[in-house]
């Protein structure tokens, strides 16, 4: 399985993601510059966290127009896998690949912490290695992570089972329905504010995030 990690000006978690996919999982991984227009060789595209284009206008608003993003949209439309982490989640909502939006945190402060999450659904390839209702711990680091959607969109997301992760216990940023991560209706595109790549190597204090990536590989082996 070949991974691609998109690099925008201002990305700062791209090497962390590549460390997980290339070094921990031993999978071929390519760094994809934001001006690239050929990603046909990739099975999985990951848009990492950071501050793409300095978060000018609003988070993800400029990155959405990068040449590579049209290719990412087409990649997703083919049913291929896409993951957006933190700023990557914001980019995916701006690009229309995921519903809703990410607004300023409720208290208007940047939050950096480890938080418990409940795995709401394992119907997506992204969460198949977890158990429904499992509580995991992942780091968060964001100033604009409050998930928002209008009432109709929120109801649709809930009814379709698109919420994959919720904040367990205290809601750190005011996200509606404690939403921490959602997928598209097909389940191949995932956006999440917590950072699974920062909880993949036990040396960092936890490895709950590694299963997110391992589940994909296990599925490929099962189908081989």
UniProtKB/Swiss-Prot annotation:
It catalyses: N(2)-formyl-N(1)-(5-phospho-beta-D-ribosyl)glycinamide + L-glutamine + ATP + H2O = 2-formamido-N(1)-(5-O-phospho-beta-D-ribosyl)acetamidine + L-glutamate + ADP + phosphate + H(+); L-glutamine + H2O = L-glutamate + NH4(+). Residues 3-224 form the Glutamine amidotransferase type-1 domain. The active site is at residues 86, 195, 197. Gene3D superfamilies: 3.40.50.880. Its EC number is 6.3.5.3, 3.5.1.2. It is found in: Cytoplasm. One of its GO terms (biological process) is 'de novo' IMP biosynthetic process. Keywords: ATP-binding, Cytoplasm, Glutamine amidotransferase, Hydrolase, Ligase, Nucleotide-binding, Purine biosynthesis. Pfam families: GATase_5. InterPro entries: Class_I_gatase-like (IPR029062), PRibForGlyAmidine_synth_PurQ (IPR010075). Pathway: Purine metabolism; IMP biosynthesis via de novo pathway; 5-amino-1-(5-phospho-D-ribosyl)imidazole from N(2)-formyl-N(1)-(5-phospho-D-ribosyl)glycinamide: step 1/2. GO terms for cellular component: cytoplasm. GO terms for molecular function: ATP binding; glutaminase activity; phosphoribosylformylglycinamidine synthase activity. Disulfide bonds: none annotated. Its main location: cytoplasm. HAMAP family: PurQ. Part of the phosphoribosylformylglycinamidine synthase complex involved in the purines biosynthetic pathway. Catalyzes the ATP-dependent conversion of formylglycinamide ribonucleotide (FGAR) and glutamine to yield formylglycinamidine ribonucleotide (FGAM) and glutamate. The FGAM synthase complex is composed of three subunits. PurQ produces an ammonia molecule by converting glutamine to glutamate. PurL transfers the ammonia molecule to FGAR to form FGAM in an ATP-dependent manner. Part of the FGAM synthase complex composed of 1 PurL, 1 PurQ and 2 PurS subunits. This is Phosphoribosylformylglycinamidine synthase subunit PurQ. It comes from Trichormus variabilis (strain ATCC 29413 / PCC 7937) (Anabaena variabilis). The lineage of its organism: Bacteria, Bacillati, Cyanobacteriota, Cyanophyceae, Nostocales. The gene is purQ.
């Amino acid at each position: 399985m070949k991974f691609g990690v998109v690099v925008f000006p201002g990305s700062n978690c791209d090497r962390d993601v590549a460390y997980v996919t290339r070094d921990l999982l031993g999978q071929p991984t390519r760094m994809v510059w934001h001006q690239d227009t050929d990603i046909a060789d990739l099975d999985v595209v990951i848009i990492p966290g950071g501050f793409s284009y300095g978060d000018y206008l609003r988070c993800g608003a400029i990155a959405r127009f990068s040449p590579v993003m049209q290719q990412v949209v087409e990649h997703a439309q083919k049913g291929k896998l896409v993951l957006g982490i933190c700023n990557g989640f914001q980019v995916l909502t701006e690009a229309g690949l995921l519903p809703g939006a990410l607004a300023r945190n409720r208290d208007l402060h940047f939050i950096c912490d480890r938080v418990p999450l409940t795995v709401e659904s394992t119907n997506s390839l992204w969460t198949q290695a977890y158990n429904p209702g499992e509580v995991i711990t992942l780091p968060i680091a964001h100033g604009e992570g409050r998930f928002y959607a209008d009432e109709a969109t929120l109801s649709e997301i809930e009814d379709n089972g698109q919420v994959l992760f919720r904040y367990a216990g205290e809601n750190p940023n005011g996200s509606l329905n404690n939403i921490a991560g959602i997928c598209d209706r097909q389940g191949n595109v995932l956006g999440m504010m917590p950072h699974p790549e920062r909880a993949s190597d036990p040396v960092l204090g936890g490895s709950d995030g590694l299963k997110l990536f391992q589940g994909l590989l296990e599925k490929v082996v099962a189908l081989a």
